Swiss-Prot record:
Summary of the knockout phenotype: Loss of lovastatin biosynthesis. Accelerates degradation of lovastatin precursors.
Subcellular location: Membrane; Endoplasmic reticulum membrane
Entry's transmembrane regions: 24-44
Assigned EC number: 1.14.14.124, 1.14.14.125
Biological source species: Aspergillus terreus
Protein name: Dihydromonacolin L monooxygenase LovA
Amino acid sequence: MTVDALTQPHHLLSLAWNDTQQHGSWFAPLVTTSAGLLCLLLYLCSSGRRSDLPVFNPKTWWELTTMRAKRDFDANAPSWIESWFSQNDKPIRFIVDSGYCTILPSSMADEFRKMKELCMYKFLGTDFHSHLPGFDGFKEVTRDAHLITKVVMNQFQTQAPKYVKPLANEASGIITDIFGDSNEWHTVPVYNQCLDLVTRTVTFIMVGSKLAHNEEWLDIAKHHAVTMAIQARQLRLWPVILRPLVHWLEPQGAKLRAQVRRARQLLDPIIQERRAERDACRAKGIEPPRYVDSIQWFEDTAKGKWYDAAGAQLAMDFAGIYGTSDLLIGGLVDIVRHPHLLEPLRDEIRTVIGQGGWTPASLYKLKLLDSCLKESQRVKPVECATMRSYALQDVTFSNGTFIPKGELVAVAADRMSNPEVWPEPAKYDPYRYMRLREDPAKAFSAQLENTNGDHIGFGWHPRACPGRFFASKEIKMMLAYLLIRYDWKVVPDEPLQYYRHSFSVRIHPTTKLMMRRRDEDIRLPGSL
């Protein structure tokens, strides 16, 4: 669960663009005319200093709009950003779907992350239309109380000893249900299976067992993110003043609002039932029951103040499901493509979990698995530029780089592939971070859940993903089961493919692996 995860889960924005092309054609003439006139008017009426940085993908003098430049960025962003920062250690501007974006080299990340004038919440609220109905999750994320961030950073950490074992037990059954027990080699759509696994596992800890086994809720949890990304993308193509009207005319807008309505209908009775139970217990002078899920943690953190419970849960699903899935799939694929890792990893899992059981301490001790995942994240970061934020006022960096108020800013992930920082950066070295953990000065930052300027896969504190601690535990838990229970190998003559769109770099949704059931399972302390 990450602020950046909220912005581009998997191939969602590629789906958004494709849907715009297929269903938004009747808008095209009006988009071109109205956007062009509005941009010209805003340019003529604007005042104040403008950025003097070059634009990598400028529109030509005869183009009324930046539509072509936006399409080009969506198609080429990762290669463009890599190309620029492999030769330049200085900022560059791009035309992106929401306007102009200044992308900084990672050498400026330390100064960037400390600037309060650059706001991630402003980005989430603006680019994901938090003021419009249907985007209720983003409205709750960006409220001044920041309740979601507090729950993720505090409750998911302190409650870990209580939820790790129940979550592991739930994941065990889900994995058997999804991946089966066939002991014959067969090809599976591992991308889709892992997405289903994460959806069901995350939902269990978010809303408890009752809704976690409700097929209608699971469908909303999985698909609401796609609908929201599609609609957000389509609205960003329109002038700001027209978006509230367009939102009511677009089919995806209607679908989005219907999903939110149904989510409320499913969740609200559970919330009301728990509150009534709590009040009744307190009236009798007895301690009310406590549930190990985020419904309970939101209630505890809110302390009786109003919050949008459904919006909070939809936002948690949006971030937790798709961000976690990408690293789970990427980590599994990298391990399978390096089969010499399978037995060392199984030995580690047998020893650590076999002796300590499912506890936060045991998950911490899975050091090789942790190193494999952090290396997967380094080799293929989920985004080529991260920590996107809007400037709340004019900002000038110490090197003179000027960012005008209202402009989008991000940091390139170029340092994660810099040979001066990482020897043989293109090579997947699963032991890289395990070796670093042997150095006391580097042991902390070498862990998957911790961040520094050399590895911004989860961002960089204080702009780091607040849910990374939970995500790392969950992913290691699921991978432990998958590696112990099943044999894996790559599909012959099927190279690994990535899907690149806008800022995102994802494992391709068509990714497949071969698998079969092994006779072994995880043996916990005290089991036969």
